[in-house]
């Protein structure tokens, strides 16, 4: 708490209770550190169903949670319409649910699939019910490192471009950093 008060003075501390859920484990990003993904067509590949989301969301509400953190792989067949439909359905079933979903690499992937722009994709998702954008997939924003551990994801520059686009449409974002692997202290 002393460190927090040094950086963020004041007596108010907030947090949110959320639930992580994966939209799909199908991914073609080939991250070296991922034990989660499956190739398209793999027998263990899945896309989470609405019934599975209902169970997870209702459990989240039972425990006082209010937000669903949705992440997933770079599925080659799940474009913008899939996520727009998913977000609309989840919000129609649970209007008070906060959707903190996808991340810059997923937005970049969808943008590429659609031949669109980051702003167009983010705006469509926001209109469908996306409340905020998690900062997943940053790993380390060094392209040297990214080429070695997650070369199928967007560049560090594109990750930042997606975040800038989100901020232009007044979307709240967060950011994460994965460190302690092959990066140098300077790259941190």
Task: Label the predicted regions.
Residues 65-174, 181:
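Conserved SAM/AdoMet-binding glycine-rich loop
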Residues 28-32, 114, 148, 188:
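Surface-exposed beta-strand edges and their flanking turn/coil or helix-capping segments
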Residues 1, 186-188:
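Short, intrinsically disordered, charge-balanced linker/junction segments flanking boundaries
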Residues 12-14, 23-24, 48-49, 60, ...:
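Residue-identity detector for threonine
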Residues 2-41, 45-71:
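N-terminal pre-triad scaffold of radical SAM enzymes
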Residues 18-19, 37-51, 106-117, 149-153, ...:
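Active-site mouth loops of central-metabolism enzymes
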Residues 22-23, 41, 75-78, 180-184:
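Glycine-/small-residue-rich active-site loops that bind phosphorylated ligands and cofactors
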């Amino acid at each position: 708490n002393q460190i927090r008060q040094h950086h963020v003075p004041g007596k108010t501390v907030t947090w949110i209770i959320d639930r992580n859920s994966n939209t799909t484990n199908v991914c073609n990003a080939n991250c070296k550190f991922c034990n989660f993904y499956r190739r398209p067509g793999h027998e263990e590949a899945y896309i989470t169903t609405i019934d599975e989301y209902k169970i997870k969301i209702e459990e989240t509400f039972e425990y006082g949670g209010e937000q669903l953190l949705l992440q997933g792989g770079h599925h080659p067949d799940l474009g913008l319409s899939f996520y727009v439909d998913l977000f609309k359905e989840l919000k129609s079933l649970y209007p008070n649910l906060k959707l903190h979903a996808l991340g810059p690499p997923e937005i970049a992937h969808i943008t590429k699939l659609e031949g669109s722009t980051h702003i167009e994709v983010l705006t469509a998702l926001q209109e469908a019910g996306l409340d905020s954008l998690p900062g997943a997939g940053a790993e380390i924003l060094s392209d040297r490192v990214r080429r070695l551990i997650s070369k199928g994801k967007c560049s560090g520059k594109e990750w930042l471009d997606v975040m800038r686009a989100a901020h232009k449409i007044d979307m709240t974002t967060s950011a994460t950093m994965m460190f302690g692997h092959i990066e140098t202290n300077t790259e941190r």
